């Protein structure tokens, strides 16, 4: 399998120019597409004669993507690929990546903290906490399962034995807000029989789901959803 890798920071010899780096990488890949590489360089506005030591972080990130794509990998691994890019460059980066995926059907694995951005096009999401995988599911499954519940507060209100995991619990006057994992609409009736006054189920964006998982005080048991 042909594998491409985009590191969070490019570290080839600083004396190399962009053009020399492209020729250097081409030697190691039988499938290197020189014409494609040149078109990427033009599109990404990479100056061919500039030494790598003089590239900005954004330019270095673009060059990393070019070097990873030009041999047309079947699997592309990216480590914080847009961390150093401004909003416009980040959008151009993602558009180029999506075009490559559409053209080649390559599998792309991205490590990033820009959760909301990735959620717009990713099929599958895996969440890690303290080096441990705690959630693996289709992207839509994360938003379906993690909710905030607005409930009426009561002195003896307990979350023990409920059919979902309570990640967090906050009191706001006469109401409480629970962050829960494993929510299903059918659980409304269960809450009613337990005397819980459920007032609202709040849908969360992908980034909010990530935040709730990260700030849960107790370790969250790993969950692996079926494909």
Task: Label each residue range with its predicted role.
Residues 93-185:
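ABC transporter nucleotide-binding domain
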Residues 17, 138, 202-205:
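Short loop/turn segments at beta->alpha junctions
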Residues 179-227:
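C-terminal coupling/interaction segments
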Residues 22, 38, 91, 143, ...:
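Generic structural signal for individual residues within well-ordered alpha-helical segments
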Residues 1-129, 134-135:
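ABC transporter nucleotide-binding domains
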């Amino acid at each position: 399998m042909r594998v491409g890798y985009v590191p969070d920071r490019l570290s080839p010899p600083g004396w190399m120019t962009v053009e020399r780096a492209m020729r250097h990488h081409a030697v190691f890949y039988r499938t290197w597409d020189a014409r494609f590489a040149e078109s990427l360089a033009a599109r990404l506005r990479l100056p061919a004669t500039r030494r790598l030591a003089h590239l900005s972080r954004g330019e270095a990130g673009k060059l990393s993507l070019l070097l990873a794509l030009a041999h047309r990998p079947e699997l592309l691994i990216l480590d914080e690929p847009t961390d150093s890019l401004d909003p416009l460059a980040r959008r151009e980066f993602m558009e180029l990546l999506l075009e490559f995926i559409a053209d080649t059907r390559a599998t792309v694995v991205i490590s990033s903290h820009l959760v909301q951005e990735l959620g717009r096009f990713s099929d599958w999401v895996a969440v890690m906490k303290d080096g441990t995988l705690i959630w693996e599911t289709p992207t839509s499954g994360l938003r379906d399962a993690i909710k905030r519940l607005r409930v009426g507060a009561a002195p003896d209100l307990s979350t023990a034995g409920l059919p979902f995991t309570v990640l967090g619990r906050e009191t706001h006057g006469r109401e409480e807000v629970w962050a829960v994992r494993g929510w299903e609409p059918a659980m409304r009736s269960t809450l009613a029989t337990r005397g819980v006054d459920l007032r609202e189920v709040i849908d969360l964006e992908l980034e909010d789901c990530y935040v709730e998982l990260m700030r849960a005080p107790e370790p969250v048991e790993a969950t692996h959803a079926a494909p």
